[in-house]
């Protein structure tokens, strides 16, 4: 088999039929990404392939940056002020050593699908690819909106602070029909959840100002959040997203909670117990709001952030210095949270992503305890980040199928900062079709292409269409 030929990742006849005849043509709903809505609105061409592929300063693809560091590249040519062409050359030298890494496949998929470049990216081919790619990047087809539209994307959900005015979402909303896709906000209240961080009090002032609420205790935090849910909902928002690096379920009385909030506002020292109390009560409030507005609550758990502290101090977060977290009992504490909220029927639609694949079976069985009322109300999210590989995707599909109803899965998301990442949906669909094809070969599911074709089309698109209520 040749590199990335028509049947790559499709290792049996049924897989080939399912992908080519059913999954490939389905539209995309990208319900979690980190695209900048201002770039979608402004719709400017990128100067060169480095700017769209690698970085704009310290904002960019930290997946690639990690590999470049492993290849011995000087930081000047990763997040620094090195020449864009030389950065691209260093990436070419890196990727030619990345056999077996998903970035090798993604890189060449993107070259083929967007630039129609079949040549392998190497140090030798890099100058030619640089020239051809940069010529194409100046055309209308390579403006952000056209890249999204040409990728058959119907919905893009960005990641937005609750204090955001959603300025660019508002500007894009009347242009949805012309664009051919929706750009919708998804609320991510990281700054509100981090009561122990410097600047928490200042953040509450910012949130209160946009919400028209003077925040001075926990009740006024909830009042402000409710207003922001109303605003995001009006703008088409249907999801929230919550990062739990670690978590312990520890509740607080109203008096204890207000005292904790006062400490946070005044930047006073907080104990681990107090931090967990605040986070638990905030999550309970957020679950109630997600239920009230019929949103989906996403949890990204068990990641270990910013391990290289000198580099974090130098260039900030999300720059490639994160790893898999190892809190062994985190699912037990999430279970306790859901047990509490089930008592008042405030369990929202939920998707769980753990960076530690050892959590997946426990999460999948926990999900089964709180299903009901909505088809596959609780979902095990697609393999995330370091698990975003053919093997990681397959493992996630296996756990989901064995513990719940995989045909109801809402499927793939890019979780990306790049407009060139949509081939990840193709990659996932190929893995999905091979997964079902192998079950056919083993005599474990019907040898019925039409029936399984319906299933893969649902996972590729239809389930997300119905589950999130974007339309």
UniProtKB/Swiss-Prot annotation:
The gene is uxaC. GO terms for biological process: D-galacturonate catabolic process; D-glucuronate catabolic process. InterPro entries: Metal_Hydrolase, Uronate_isomerase. It holds the Pfam family UxaC. Keywords: Isomerase. One of its GO terms (molecular function) is glucuronate isomerase activity. This is Uronate isomerase. Its EC number is 5.3.1.12. It catalyses: D-glucuronate = D-fructuronate; aldehydo-D-galacturonate = keto-D-tagaturonate. Coiled coil: none annotated. SUPFAM superfamilies: Metallo-dependent hydrolases (SSF51556). It is an enzyme of class 5 (isomerase). Belongs to the metallo-dependent hydrolases superfamily. Uronate isomerase family. Pathway: Carbohydrate metabolism; pentose and glucuronate interconversion. NCBIfam families: PRK02925.1 (NF002794). It comes from Latilactobacillus sakei subsp. sakei (strain 23K) (Lactobacillus sakei subsp. sakei). PANTHER family: URONATE ISOMERASE.
């Amino acid at each position: 088999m040749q590199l990335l030929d028509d049947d790559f990742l499709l290792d049996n006849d049924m897989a080939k039929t399912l992908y080519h005849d059913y999954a490939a043509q389905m539209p995309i709903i990208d319900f979690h990404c980190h695209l900048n809505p201002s770039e979608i609105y402004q719709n400017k061409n990128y100067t060169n392939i480095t700017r769209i592929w690698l970085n704009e300063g310290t904002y960019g693809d930290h997946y690639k940056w990690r590999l470049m560091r492993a290849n011995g590249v000087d930081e000047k040519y990763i997040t620094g002020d090195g020449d864009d062409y030389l950065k691209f050359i260093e990436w070419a030298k890196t990727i030619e050593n990345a056999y077996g890494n998903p970035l090798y496949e993604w890189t060449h998929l993107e070259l083929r699908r967007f630039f129609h470049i079949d040549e392998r990216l190497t140090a030798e081919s890099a100058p030619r690819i640089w020239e051809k790619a940069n010529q194409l990047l100046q055309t209308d087809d390579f403006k952000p909106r056209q890249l999204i539209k040409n990728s058959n994307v119907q919905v893009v959900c960005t990641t937005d602070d609750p204090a955001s005015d959603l300025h660019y979402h508002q500007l894009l909303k009347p242009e949805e029909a012309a664009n051919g896709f929706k750009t919708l906000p998804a609320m991510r209240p990281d700054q509100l959840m981090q009561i122990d961080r410097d600047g928490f009090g200042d953040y509450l002032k910012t949130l209160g100002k946009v919400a028209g609420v003077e925040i001075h205790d926990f009740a006024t935090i909830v009042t402000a959040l409710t207003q922001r849910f109303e605003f995001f909902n009006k703008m088409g928002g249907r999801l929230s997203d919550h990062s739990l690096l670690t978590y312990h379920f520890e509740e607080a009385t109203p008096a204890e909670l207000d005292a904790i909030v006062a400490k946070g506002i005044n930047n006073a020292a907080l104990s681990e117990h107090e931090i967990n109390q605040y986070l638990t009560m905030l999550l309970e409030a957020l679950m109630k709001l997600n239920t009230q507005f019929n949103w989906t609550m996403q949890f990204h758990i068990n990641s270990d952030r910013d391990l290289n502290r000198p580099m974090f101090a130098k260039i900030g977060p999300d720059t490639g210095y994160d790893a898999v977290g190892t809190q062994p009992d985190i699912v037990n504490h999430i279970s306790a949270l859901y047990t509490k909220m089930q008592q008042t029927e405030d369990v929202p639609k939920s998707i769980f992503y753990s960076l530690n694949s050892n959590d997946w079976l426990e999460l999948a069985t926990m999900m089964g305890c709180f299903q009901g009322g909505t088809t596959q109300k609780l979902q095990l999210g697609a393999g995330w980040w370091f698990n975003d590989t053919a093997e990681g995707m397959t493992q996630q599909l296996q756990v989901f199928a064995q513990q719940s109803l995989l045909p109801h899965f809402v499927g793939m998301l890019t979780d990306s900062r790049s407009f060139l990442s949509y081939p990840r949906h193709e990659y996932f669909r190929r893995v999905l079709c091979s997964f079902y094809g192998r079950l056919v070969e083993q005599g474990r599911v019907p040898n019925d292409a039409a029936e399984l074709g319906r299933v893969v089309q649902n996972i590729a698109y239809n389930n997300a269409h119905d589950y999130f209520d974007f339309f």
